[in-house]
Amino acid sequence: MFVTSMSAAEKLSIKDITSGKFAAKTVNGINPIEGTDTYARISDDGKRVDSYSFKTGKKIATLFDVDNTMGKKIKDFDGYILSPDGTRMLIQTETERIYRRSFRATYYIYTIASHKLARLSDGDKQQVPVWSNDGLQVAFVRDNNIFLVKLLYDNAEIQVTKDGKRNEVINGLPDWVNEEEFGFNRAMTFNADGTMICWLRYDEQRVK
């Protein structure tokens, strides 16, 4: 039996509860690095992506640092997506929320060895970028259409679909109902060797 004296009790306020004062501490942006016994995570100050050993929990290296890039410069970032081979990452910035799980953002391609940072696209913000398995292509959605960026061709950008239109046709993204009910925000992927893209196409033209 545990007894707590009234003198030691503290009053709880609505502000304490809603401010996150009693929220559990979490670690953001953890991703295993494929083919290794290490993982990557965003630093506590939100300025870096560091790698750590699963065995020891100790930091091994800094993979990305906003203050140490060649080419483009950014002040901060909201997330990252490692390439399957672990040599590059997509850096997510200027995030704009849409629904519960969906958002658009400005992405950059970062090469870890050279510290080179370059825009994924010179167009408007992108959604749900995904790497090909060889890490040499990135597909993304903009304005309900799918685009492809080829890294070996000087980041050449190709528009894959052209029929996407708000409230009519959606390529590569779930509609709001599917996003909400099934809990996903991307509806496209590469095949194993990166020669094809498979996606869902939603036609809402007859939806009232």
Question: Which sequence ranges carry the predicted segments?
Answer:
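Hydrophobic h-region of N-terminal signal peptides that target proteins for export
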Residues: M1-S7
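Beta-propeller folds
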Residues: A8-K208
